[in-house]
Amino acid sequence: MYAFLTGPMLWASLLVFFGGLLARVIWYIRGLDWRLDRVAYKPHLAIGLQGAVQSALKWLVPFGTYSWRQQPFFTVAFFLFHIGAVLVPLFLAGHNVILEERFGFSLPALPMGVADTLTVLAIIGLVMIALRRIALTEVRILTTGYDWFILAVSAAPFVTGFLARLHVGDYDTWLLAHIITGELFLIVAPFTKLSHIVLFFMSRGQLGMDYAIKRGGATRGPAFPW
């Protein structure tokens, strides 16, 4: 089972993940209206890209935007989870062993203590996000079973992996559960809200280009005929 999950199934999961996310990016770009978007973006690409990068970077800094500062609890929860969600899967030593075995390369590995800390903080962040969905009326009434499914899919690889790391119960069982839930995440990501892995950058980039080109950002230089 382990050989299958870290061999053919891993290849298939990564193919779906990267292929699906690439398709989402292509569909997003093709969905732009040439009369409203492309006609402005192409002639003013340089200033548009500058606005796109600035827009994305501001939202990647904790409390870097007004909206983050207005929701401190959610901001802390969001960054606790997402920092771990990026760093642990990519730089965990155990993951890089598999990368080296299956693909012939590896990334720098986090110290085990750092990886453990990031994992615990990521789980705490997910618990905080879940509590927010329960406690805030305006969030609770919009929450559906689909949202809980996304939270569960996001949490499962961290929880199962950490239980395996601590050798709670049967190690092999938790290890297989960790691999299965991790590959489930990869497979469902392109087809769910988890596609924000790339669509966040697309949407923030589009808004940044809009503000830089169309909505007054360009007044710092020569006026554009918009």
From Swiss-Prot:
GO cellular component: plasma membrane
InterPro entries: NarG-like_sf, sulf_resp_HmcE
Main subcellular location of this protein, as a coarse class: membrane
Transmembrane segments: 1-23, 46-57, 73-99, 112-131, 141-164, 194-222
Membrane topology reported for the UniProt record: Multi-pass membrane protein
Compartment annotation: Cell membrane
GO MF assignments: metal ion binding
Known cofactor(s): heme b
Key words, A-Z: Cell membrane, Heme, Iron, Membrane, Metal-binding, Transmembrane, Transmembrane helix
NCBIfam families named in the record: sulf_resp_HmcE (NF045716)
Function, in words: HMWC (high-molecular-weight cytochrome c), ORF2, ORF3, ORF4, ORF5 and ORF6 in the HMC operon form a transmembrane protein complex that allows electron flow from the periplasmic hydrogenase to the cytoplasmic enzymes that catalyze reduction of sulfates.
Protein name: Protein DVU_0532
